[in-house]
UniProtKB/Swiss-Prot annotation:
This is Transposon Tf2-11 polyprotein. The gene is Tf2-11. Residues 979-1138 form the Integrase catalytic domain. InterPro entries: Aspartic_peptidase_AS, DNA/RNA_pol_sf, Integrase_cat-core, Integrase_H2C2, Peptidase_aspartic_dom_sf, Retrovirus_Pol_polyprotein, Rev_trsase/Diguanyl_cyclase, RNaseH-like_sf. Mg(2+) 2 binds at D990, D1050. Processing of the polyproteins proceeds by an ordered pathway, called maturation. It involves the initial cleavage of a 27 kDa capsid protein (CA) from the N-terminus of the polyprotein, followed by the cleavage of a 56 kDa integrase (IN) from the C-terminus. This leaves a 72 kDa protease-reverse transcriptase fusion protein (PR-RT), which does not seem to be processed further.
Length: 1333
């Protein structure tokens, strides 16, 4: 039968229309009355009856009535050629064949066996079909179909309806169960039908009518449970009469579906003919929608045949403002990005408006669904169910009352209510009224009370809770422990049947100790109330409730019950003992007057959900809702949201391989010194985590009767282990995984000690499993030497090993060796860091806590073995076992390993250079220094001359040279400037800028006499010109003290301008400039500036914009203070007298103010001696802090220090510490050098530098090949040399950097890279040097 024929027949079968069902009630009583009315209409001879009183006799009448029509079902039938004129007769024959193909089943016999599965005759199958139909639909759908079918005219269809009515009456009498959950939708070609169904439909042609498909036999899977018979049908979707029938067209439209959780929208086909919700793989990838495997794995037919093996999680979708939540099957190809099926629309009461091309949502008809009933065998305990008990004040149980002890009695809580909107006010009043009615709260006169707030419940209503956070600060903690989840799950091993109990309003089952009620007072707009039962929100409530329930359950808790708070799980190994176990627990609860929430209880199940896990006899997996919570998580916007996400992941970490590795990029964002910046790395990390949760592994229950295997391993930074047990199929299945960081001290352990540490930590982690084993369990390690250390009875090497050996005596185990290649799980775990486990403190060492590592791959091993053939000594060890034994060297996987677990390598080879480069430049430690790099490499490798080779490599590293500061003393001794012979011959000048504006000025011009130290202070502006400065200097200095012989100043543009040069020529003085970025050459002015600024702060710190008004006072104060260098005041040296500084003091005049007088000459001579002595003293102290000058020769490469305000300074803190390298042109003084700066910066900076600002650039051509990033080469200036290395031509080029155009650099690069940068220069060099390329 073709798919097209099937679709046609499907439409023809829907030839009936529904009646208007508005206002129809759907209780069982109304449904029975509805049946009675239909029967009265079609079988009037039965008469009316009261179905509430006489249902059984009514059904008997129906049975008797149908026995009067035996002729309808003859034992034989005649085959006829059918035409359109004989269609009804053909349909009747079809109905007859379905009942009596074997000729052994009468209508009455069929009625007496409703729903029972016996044999394989067609009647039984038809019965199963009706049972499936009955359980497939909810009540509303069922009524719609009954009312529609009861009004059709053709006889045989009416007969089918009449048959189904008494059958349905029986089902309503037997049970109250409706199945509203829609089964998975299958393609027609995959749907399994009976042979009769296929044979019959092959005879139909497209023009013919056929029977409604809901009355055709289908294959069913029937399972029996304790109370109900449930039938699940694998079927094609049931099309609704609202949308699709033979008189209506197939509706199709395309709407934009909004996915708010993923901030995207997709075009979605709305098609009443589509059999399932589908979405294309391309759409899933584009919007990163989470998916999971689909075990059904069917073929989806049609125009685009697809094999489906994945589906999305339930997604929140908005269509025309209507919100729904549904899943999609993922297909490779479809006509639209996504499609919504008819079933999804119907389930969400959504109608299609074909005229408006829109969707609308109808009001849902509520179904009356009763809570699950308590099984009959436990009816004696029905008085402890929530159905029979309303919430009331419980009786106090002595010794188990809730006690609230405070750290202090005299405390006050803040008095403030949270504002409540009208909706919450109503909820609050309802809660208060209910609490007062039941007696669990009462009005209070307490002086301290906490505010109330509201939290949403799962069903959408609000729960009033008290915010006890202010009170919790004063409550003494309860140290009663909550159980560990892992230990609870361990008790379940071996159990096959489970019952889960949930206590109703669990906290409210415990009375508050008399006298403590006022401590739990709360306030709201209605007043102040206090709890008489234990409330939610108090910090000590969980611990007290755990103590309470443990005490109530007593001894049963230890054998067959586990409980976590109000969740109680009863587990047993057989059905018979389980009944006894459940009754024991229910009796305990009854004795304590506790109430169970029947709606949340599950009895006699093979698998249950408990405290977030799906538990069965095989093991446990996380509940799907916890997985969906992570899968639906949006991108975190801040640290708080990221911590919440990682908290959800951490709950599931035991099911996620390599959790720490996956979350590493996310944890980096939580560090205090890391700025929040979301990158694709974090996005990918979240996607990787979600993919791991699509199908999490099953962890088995630990069973003490099974063999135990512990596999351990240690990496450089962590330890790992996997605990497994051997099952009946002789395979080991995991019980748990473990990994943990090492502490700083542990990082320095030897390899053997690290491997031993992995065993110790694993045994401590699973001590509750492994400490009491009768038979020895097996430990596998990939470190052969460890076996001897554990089994050796000689004295331990150190105290640590002695402690470990003492600890191992508590365990019954045997240890075996297995190569690391076979121990891949534990090996991988040891390279994962469990970031939730605290790192143990250890005072033995404080060295670095992270070590790089090189992967020992097969290629690496082959390379080492190849290098061994070139080293005579190592080759001898490789081939001579006796020699290896003599030198305590092992041969492992082709590698020579010494007693320190170091791999022996030939000295100074390409391999050793590669190792150094990987650890220095490509590892997780960023360019470690010589000592650190040496220590790291020595942990895994050793060769002759290793320290020297590492030192040479690090010293020649370009990145280290330009970015790392130097720790040596500065170069160059101090060269003091000789003092002048008299005042105002030699001056120094500078500007103090960045002053607040005062009277129009914002800078200060400072002139200092180098002999007397006298200062002249002149207010000015920062925008002062050279001409204005010259005029000011003429009026304030030359006019009073005459022409100077020399002036020392910095390289300010004013003093280097042509205007100032003309001014100096006019007054015949020489300009001398201090070295750039060398304040010591003009230290006098710098020191004077500091003193002036200090004096200004003293006089105008409160009113800084008045500093101009105080300049004369500051100048007078400075010039009349005794200077440490001259031992006299500047004013006295210049003017030869001391002025009066207060009204109580008279000025002192000298009799000889003539500068040529003997006294004046003597004073000047004394000042000069003091200045010389001061210079010698300064030089002595300065030179103690410097080291010998490093002599540079012309042509040497040097780097220039980037000072805070100097050469090529960048405000960016991450800018390199040095610029360059530059070539030395010549030496221009005792301590100064002239450098070859690029033309682009020559006009900006002086090319002369003091030696203290220079560092030699080290460059070993044998070590540094292709050190330049090709994107950094701008313009090649010239090529210095070339080398052939491993059949590759390298060029040493001098170039202008692309990244920093102001810098000329040099380095090695490949020929190809150089040609891309400047083809002409490279070709000229090749031609001039006769290179064969």
């Amino acid at each position: 039968m073709s798919y097209a024929n099937y679709r046609y027949m499907k439409a023809r079968a829907k030839r009936w229309r529904p009646e208007n069902l508005d206002g129809i009630q759907t209780s069982d009583e109304h449904l029975i009355n509805l049946f009675a009315k239909i029967l009265s209409k079609h079988v009037p001879e039965i008469g009316k009856f009261d179905p509430n009183k006489d249902v059984e006799s009514y059904i008997s009448k129906l049975d008797q009535h149908f026995t009067e029509y035996p002729s309808l079902f003859p034992n034989e039938h005649t085959k006829r050629q059918y035409t359109l004129n004989h269609l009804e007769e053909l349909e009747q024959q079809f109905a007859e064949r379905m009942f009596s193909e074997n000729g052994s089943l009468t209508w009455q016999e069929l009625l007496r066996q409703p729903g029972k599965v016996q044999g394989s005759n067609k009647g039984d199958r038809l019965t199963k079909t009706f049972e499936g139909f009955r359980n497939q639909l909810d009540k509303v759908q069922f009524i719609r179909k009954l009312m529609s079918k009861a009004n059709v005219d053709d006889f045989h269809t009416r007969l089918f309806i009449l048959w189904m009515l008494p059958y349905s009456l029986r089902k309503l009498k037997e049970r109250n169960y409706w199945k509203s959950e829609i089964s998975e939708i299958y393609d027609f070609l995959e749907d399994k039908r009976t042979a009769s169904y296929g044979k019959t439909h092959k005879r139909f042609q497209p023009q013919n009518k056929n029977l409604g498909k809901e009355f055709l036999p289908k294959k069913n899977n029937t399972t029996n449970s304790r109370n109900l018979r449930k039938t699940n049908i694998s079927r094609i979707e049931y099309s609704s009469n609202k949308f699709l029938n033979h008189t209506r067209k197939r509706y199709e439209m395309v709407l934009q579906a909004e996915l708010p959780d993923f901030k995207c929208s997709i075009p979605c086909l709305i098609d009443t003919g589509t059999q399932a919700n589908i979405i294309t793989e391309e759409t899933v990838r584009a919007h990163k929608l989470p998916t999971r495997p689909w075990s059904k794995s069917v073929i989806y037919g049609g125009v685009y045949p697809n094999k489906i093996n994945r589906k999305t999680i339930k997604l929140n979708i908005s269509l025309n403002g209507i919100s729904i939540k549904t899943e999609f099957l993922v297909v490779k190809k479809f006509s639209h990005p996504a499609a919504i099926s008819f079933t999804t629309l119907y389930d969400n009461n959504i109608e299609i408006s074909s005229s408006k091309h829109t969707l609308s949502q109808m009001n849902k008809v509520s179904n009356i669904v009763k809570e699950p009933e308590l099984p009959d065998i436990y009816k004696e305990f029905k008085d402890i169910t929530a159905e029979t008990n309303t919430e009331k004040l419980p009786k106090p149980i002595k010794g188990l009352e809730f006690e609230v002890e405070l750290t202090q009695e005299n405390y006050r809580l803040p008095i403030r209510n949270y504002p409540l909107p009208p909706g919450k006010m109503q909820a609050m009043n309802d809660e208060i009224n209910q609490g007062l009615k039941s007696g669990i709260i009462r009005e209070s006169k307490a002086i301290n009370a906490c505010p109330v707030m509201f939290v949403p419940k799962k069903e959408g209503t609000l729960r009033m809770v008290v915010d006890y956070k202010p009170l919790n600060k004063y409550v003494k903690p309860n140290i009663y422990p909550l159980p560990l989840i892992e230990q609870l799950l361990a008790k379940i091993q071996g159990s096959t049947i489970f019952t889960k109990l949930d206590l109703k309003s669990a906290y409210h089952l415990i009375r508050v100790r008399k006298g403590d009620e006022h401590k739990l007072a709360f306030r709201c707009p209605r007043g102040v109330f206090e709890y008489l039962v234990m409330p939610y929100g108090i910090s000590i409530a969980p611990a007290h409730f755990q103590y309470f329930i443990n005490t109530i359950l007593g001894e049963v808790k230890e054998s067959h019950v586990v409980c976590y708070m109000d969740n109680i799980l009863i587990h047993s190994k057989s059905e018979s003992e389980h009944v006894k176990h459940v009754k024991d627990v229910l009796q305990k609860l009854k004795n304590a007057n506790l109430i169970i929430n029947q709606a949340k209880c599950e009895f006699h199940q093979s698998q249950v959900k408990f405290i977030g896990y799906h538990i069965s006899e095989k093991g446990f997996t996380p509940c799907q809702e916890n997985i969906d919570k992570v899968l639906q998580w949006k991108q975190p916007k801040n640290r708080k949201e990221l911590r919440q996400f990682l908290g959800s992941v951490n709950y599931l970490r035991k099911f996620i391989p390599k959790t720490s590795q996956l979350t590493h990029p996310l944890n980096n964002l939580l560090k205090k010194d890391v700025r929040w910046k979301w990158t694709p790395t974090q996005t990918q990390a979240i996607e990787n985590i979600k993919q791991c949760l699509v199908s999490p592994p099953v962890l088995r229950h630990f069973d003490f009767s099974k063999k135990i295997l512990l596999e351990t391993d240690a990496s450089d930074v962590a330890v790992g282990a996997v605990l497994s047990q051997k099952h009946d199929d002789d395979k080991y299945y995991p019980v748990g995984y473990y990994s943990a960081k090492m502490s700083k001290a542990q990082l320095n352990y030897s390899v053997s000690d690290k491997e031993m540490l992995a065993i110790i930590k694993s045994l401590k982690h699973w001590r509750h499993y492994l400490e009491s084993t009768i038979e020895p369990f097996k430990i596998l390690t990939d470190h052969r030497n460890l076996i001897g250390r554990i089994t050796n009875e000689s004295e331990p090497e150190n105290k640590r090993l002695a402690r470990w050996q003492l600890f191992l005596q508590d365990f019954n185990f045997e240890i075996n060796y297995r190569p690391g290649s076979a121990n891949h799980i534990a090996d991988a775990l040891s390279r994962i860091v469990d970031e939730t486990e605290p790192i143990p403190k250890d005072s033995e060492d404080n060295s670095i806590n992270f070590v790089n590592q090189i992967s020992i791959t097969d290629d690496f091993k082959n390379q080492v073995v190849t290098e061994y053939t070139n080293d005579t000594k190592l080759l001898n060890l490789l081939n001579n076992e006796d020699k290896r034994v003599e030198e305590n060297i092992q041969l492992k996987d082709g590698l020579l390993i010494n007693s320190k677990d170091q791999i022996l390598l030939p000295n100074d080879t390409q391999l050793t250079r590669t190792i150094i480069k990987k650890y220095h430049e490509e590892g997780k430690l960023i360019h470690p220094g010589i000592e650190l790099l040496t220590n790291i490499i020595l942990r895994r490798f050793t060769w002759k001359g290793i320290r020297k080779q590492i030192q040479e490599y690090v010293q020649n590293c370009h990145t280290c040279q330009i970015n790392k500061s130097r720790n040596h003393k500065p170069y160059g001794p101090l060269q003091p400037i000789p003092p002048s012979e008299r005042p105002w011959e030699s001056l120094s000048m500078d500007f103090i800028t960045a002053l607040p504006e005062s009277s129009g000025y914002n800078a200060l011009f400072v002139v200092v006499d180098r002999f007397s130290k006298m200062a002249i202070l002149v207010p000015c502006t920062k925008s002062i010109t050279a001409e204005q400065t010259a005029r000011m200097f003429d009026q304030r200095v030359i006019a009073y003290f005459g022409n100077p012989k020399e002036i020392i100043a910095d390289n300010d543009h004013i003093f280097t301008s042509q205007t100032w040069k003309d001014f100096a020529h006019k007054y015949n003085f020489v300009m001398k400039f201090s070295l750039p970025y060398r304040p010591q050459t003009d230290g006098q002015t710098e020191r004077t500036n500091q003193t002036v600024e200090k004096l200004l702060r003293c006089v105008c710190s409160t009113h800084p914009n008045t500093w101009v008004d105080h300049i004369s006072l500051v100048q007078q104060s400075y010039n009349n203070a005794i200077h440490s260098a001259t031992q006299m005041t500047p004013f006295e040296i210049v003017h030869r007298y001391s002025p009066a500084l207060s009204p109580l003091e008279l000025p002192s005049f000298s009799d000889k103010t003539d500068e040529n007088s003997q006294e004046t000459i003597q004073v000047f001579q004394t000042v000069k001696e003091h200045l010389n002595t001061n210079n010698i003293k300064m030089k002595k102290y300065f030179d103690m802090k410097i080291q010998e000058i490093e002599e540079f020769q012309p042509g040497d490469l040097v780097m220039v220090k980037r000072t805070k305000t100097g050469f090529l300074h960048k405000s960016n803190k991450l800018a390199p510490s040095f610029a360059g390298p530059f070539y030395v042109l010549q030496k221009s003084g005792p301590n100064n050098y002239e450098l070859d700066l690029p033309d682009s910066i020559k006009h900006m900076f002086s090319s002369t530098f003091h030696v203290s600002h220079l560092e030699k650039y080290r460059h070993n051509s044998e070590l540094n090949y292709a050190t330049i990033d090709e994107s950094d080469i701008g313009t090649i200036l010239h090529i210095l040399e070339h080398k052939n290395r491993e059949q590759v031509l390298y060029l040493n080029v001098k170039y202008i950097s692309n990244l920093n155009p102001s810098t000329i650099m040099s380095g090695w690069t490949t020929l190809a890279t150089a040609l891309q940068a400047d083809k002409a220069i490279v070709n000229d060099y090749i031609k001039n040097n006769n290179l064969n390329i």
